[in-house]
């Protein structure tokens, strides 16, 4: 009898320990998961303020002072020209309603109502249309009408959570539809930088309008999981497991998408639209190897441009002529 009671006590203790562990794990998941959702993909999060705490996790060559000077001088020059262009070219505010009901806003820059060539230019993570407006200027100079939207949860667009490209690829289809409704004969190029690049790559594997003729991606990442794993190591010196797993669970519930499913790498395997891959070999945010993996995985017509000594989305400032010549040559091939 006493032995039986002892077994019951032991079993009870085991159950208490197991339940306690479950409660601790659930609590940790909620706490850690919510922290990283708030930090990384909340509209008001601090994920855009990047501070690298683990330098060893960022394996890129340093950009020398002379190169940095060239990049900054070209950036300033391009921005000044782009601001002048945006004030002179005819433009109008436009908006669409996303599949989940939020309102997305952007600006069309009209070179000529009669022309069929259009480009949609997408900005990056925690950024704005101003960061990519010089790209629109170069396309306009080549005879394109230009659409530059605010990504969801950015600027004038609604939304509480950043889509990291996965939700944004559905938003992109709404913008494509807007142009096609205006001009059924439109020829549309998609250009994305950073998260915008991930967006156009993630869209490439879906069925897009026949009006979409080419995709240009600059500094895109292989998947949401991969970029967050890289940044967890660089920013917080934290391991992928279990941090990202906790993040994934809470992001699924709050932001309504799965960071593990959100893969540009898997999407480009299904792509049929021509893609030009561009990357700087000194990118310390999205490592160059991600570009190489994406390029190798793509099963469509493709080309690649790697700019030496360029950091994240800096290729167009490091070698401006090379950058745009490659883009417009790609269309004529």
Predicted regions and their residues:
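Alpha/beta-hydrolase active-site loop
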Residues: 131, 162-183
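Conserved alpha/beta-hydrolase
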Residues: 136-158
């Amino acid at each position: 009898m006493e032995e039986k009671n002892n077994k019951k006590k032991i079993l009870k203790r085991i159950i208490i320990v197991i339940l306690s562990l479950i409660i601790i794990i659930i609590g940790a998941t909620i706490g850690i998961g919510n922290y990283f959702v708030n930090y990384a993909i909340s509209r008001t999060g601090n994920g855009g303020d990047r501070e690298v705490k683990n330098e060893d996790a960022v394996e890129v060559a340093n950009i020398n002072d002379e190169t940095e000077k060239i990049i900054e001088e070209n950036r300033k020059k391009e921005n000044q020209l782009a601001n002048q262009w945006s004030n002179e070219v005819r433009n109008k505010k436009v908006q669409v309603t996303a599949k989940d009901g939020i309102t997305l806003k952007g600006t069309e820059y009209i070179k000529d109502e009669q022309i069929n060539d259009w480009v949609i230019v997408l900005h990056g993570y925690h950024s704005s249309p101003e960061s990519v407006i010089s790209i629109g200027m170069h396309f306009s100079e080549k005879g394109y009408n230009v659409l530059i939207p605010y990504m969801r949860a950015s600027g004038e667009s609604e939304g509480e959570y950043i889509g990291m490209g996965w939700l944004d690829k559905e938003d992109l289809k709404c913008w494509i539809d807007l142009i096609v409704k205006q001009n059924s004969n439109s020829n549309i190029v998609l250009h994305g930088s950073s998260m915008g690049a991930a967006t156009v790559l993630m869209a490439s594997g879906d069925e897009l309008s026949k009006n979409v003729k080419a995709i240009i991606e600059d500094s895109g990442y292989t998947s949401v999981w991969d970029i967050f794993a890289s940044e967890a190591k660089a920013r917080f010196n934290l391991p992928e497991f279990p941090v990202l797993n906790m993040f994934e669970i809470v992001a699924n519930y709050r932001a309504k998408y799965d960071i593990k499913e959100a893969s540009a790498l898997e999407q480009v395997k299904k792509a049929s639209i021509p893609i030009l891959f561009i990357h700087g070999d000194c990118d310390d945010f999205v490592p160059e190897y991600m570009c190489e993996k994406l390029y190798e995985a793509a099963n469509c017509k493709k080309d690649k441009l790697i700019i030496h000594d360029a950091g994240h989305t800096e290729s167009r400032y490091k070698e401006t002529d090379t950058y745009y010549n490659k883009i417009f040559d790609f269309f004529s091939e």
